[in-house]
Amino acid sequence: MCSSDLGTKLEQCSTAPLTGFFRNGCCDTGPQDQGLHTVCALMTAEFLALSKYLGNDLSTPRPEYGFAGLKPGDKWCLCATRFLQAHEEGAAPNVRLNATHTKTLSVVPLEILQLYAAD
Protein backbone atom coordinates (compact mmCIF):
# COMPACT_ATOMS: atom_id res chain seq x y z
CA MET A 1 0.00 0.00 0.00
CA CYS A 2 1.23 3.47 -0.84
CA SER A 3 1.08 6.27 1.70
CA SER A 4 0.97 10.02 1.24
CA ASP A 5 2.92 12.81 2.94
CA LEU A 6 0.28 12.79 5.63
CA GLY A 7 0.71 9.09 6.42
CA THR A 8 -2.67 8.23 4.91
CA LYS A 9 -3.61 6.10 1.92
CA LEU A 10 -2.23 7.61 -1.27
CA GLU A 11 -5.06 9.18 -3.26
CA GLN A 12 -5.25 9.06 -7.03
CA CYS A 13 -3.69 12.04 -8.79
CA SER A 14 -5.23 11.88 -12.28
CA THR A 15 -6.62 9.45 -14.83
CA ALA A 16 -7.38 12.13 -17.43
CA PRO A 17 -4.64 12.63 -18.34
CA LEU A 18 -3.37 9.31 -17.06
CA THR A 19 -0.33 10.07 -14.90
CA GLY A 20 2.21 8.36 -12.69
CA PHE A 21 5.45 6.56 -13.41
CA PHE A 22 3.41 3.36 -13.81
CA ARG A 23 0.60 5.21 -15.68
CA ASN A 24 -1.91 4.06 -13.09
CA GLY A 25 -3.14 7.52 -12.05
CA CYS A 26 -1.15 7.35 -8.81
CA CYS A 27 2.13 9.08 -7.87
CA ASP A 28 3.52 5.87 -6.46
CA THR A 29 7.09 4.80 -7.05
CA GLY A 30 9.44 1.86 -7.11
CA PRO A 31 13.10 1.01 -7.70
CA GLN A 32 12.79 1.55 -11.45
CA ASP A 33 11.52 5.15 -10.99
CA GLN A 34 14.88 6.92 -10.99
CA GLY A 35 13.20 10.34 -11.32
CA LEU A 36 10.96 9.89 -8.27
CA HIS A 37 7.69 10.94 -10.02
CA THR A 38 5.94 11.39 -6.67
CA VAL A 39 4.56 14.95 -6.49
CA CYS A 40 0.92 15.33 -7.56
CA ALA A 41 0.91 18.84 -9.02
CA LEU A 42 -1.72 21.06 -10.63
CA MET A 43 -0.19 22.39 -13.82
CA THR A 44 0.12 26.12 -14.39
CA ALA A 45 1.19 28.01 -17.50
CA GLU A 46 4.19 29.31 -15.56
CA PHE A 47 5.37 25.85 -14.53
CA LEU A 48 4.80 24.37 -17.99
CA ALA A 49 6.86 27.19 -19.54
CA LEU A 50 9.67 26.63 -17.02
CA SER A 51 9.66 22.89 -17.63
CA LYS A 52 9.83 23.43 -21.40
CA TYR A 53 12.66 25.94 -20.97
CA LEU A 54 14.55 23.40 -18.84
CA GLY A 55 14.19 20.74 -21.54
CA ASN A 56 11.13 18.77 -20.47
CA ASP A 57 8.30 19.91 -22.73
CA LEU A 58 5.13 18.67 -21.07
CA SER A 59 2.74 20.86 -23.06
CA THR A 60 3.39 19.70 -26.63
CA PRO A 61 1.35 16.68 -27.74
CA ARG A 62 3.41 13.57 -28.55
CA PRO A 63 0.92 11.24 -30.27
CA GLU A 64 3.62 8.63 -30.92
CA TYR A 65 3.70 8.11 -27.14
CA GLY A 66 -0.04 8.52 -26.62
CA PHE A 67 0.63 11.85 -24.86
CA ALA A 68 -1.84 14.67 -25.56
CA GLY A 69 0.25 17.34 -23.82
CA LEU A 70 -0.60 19.04 -20.55
CA LYS A 71 -2.45 22.30 -20.04
CA PRO A 72 -3.00 24.52 -17.01
CA GLY A 73 -5.32 22.79 -14.55
CA ASP A 74 -4.21 19.25 -15.42
CA LYS A 75 -2.87 17.13 -12.56
CA TRP A 76 0.45 15.35 -13.15
CA CYS A 77 3.00 13.38 -11.15
CA LEU A 78 6.17 15.47 -11.18
CA CYS A 79 9.72 14.45 -10.36
CA ALA A 80 10.50 15.61 -6.85
CA THR A 81 13.72 17.31 -7.98
CA ARG A 82 11.88 19.24 -10.71
CA PHE A 83 9.30 20.43 -8.19
CA LEU A 84 12.07 21.62 -5.85
CA GLN A 85 13.79 23.36 -8.77
CA ALA A 86 10.52 25.08 -9.71
CA HIS A 87 10.14 26.21 -6.09
CA GLU A 88 13.63 27.69 -6.16
CA GLU A 89 12.79 29.47 -9.45
CA GLY A 90 9.51 30.83 -8.04
CA ALA A 91 7.36 28.79 -10.43
CA ALA A 92 6.25 25.78 -8.37
CA PRO A 93 2.69 24.60 -9.00
CA ASN A 94 0.21 23.77 -6.25
CA VAL A 95 0.24 20.18 -5.03
CA ARG A 96 -2.27 17.68 -3.72
CA LEU A 97 -0.58 16.41 -0.55
CA ASN A 98 -2.93 13.42 -0.19
CA ALA A 99 -1.86 12.25 -3.66
CA THR A 100 1.87 12.97 -3.13
CA HIS A 101 4.00 10.01 -2.05
CA THR A 102 6.02 10.09 1.19
CA LYS A 103 9.23 9.33 -0.74
CA THR A 104 9.01 12.95 -1.92
CA LEU A 105 10.20 13.96 1.53
CA SER A 106 13.65 12.54 0.77
CA VAL A 107 14.03 15.46 -1.69
CA VAL A 108 11.50 18.15 -0.74
CA PRO A 109 10.90 19.19 2.89
CA LEU A 110 7.27 18.92 4.01
CA GLU A 111 7.31 22.62 4.94
CA ILE A 112 7.96 23.52 1.29
CA LEU A 113 5.23 21.19 0.01
CA GLN A 114 2.78 22.70 2.49
CA LEU A 115 3.39 26.16 0.98
CA TYR A 116 1.74 24.87 -2.21
CA ALA A 117 -0.94 22.62 -0.69
CA ALA A 118 -4.16 22.58 -2.69
CA ASP A 119 -5.90 20.17 -0.30
Model-found features: residue ranges?
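Short alpha-helix capping/helix-loop boundary micro-motifs
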Residues: 59-66
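Active-site microenvironments that recognize anionic phosphate/pyrophosphate groups
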Residues: 5-34
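Short, compositionally biased
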Residues: 83-106
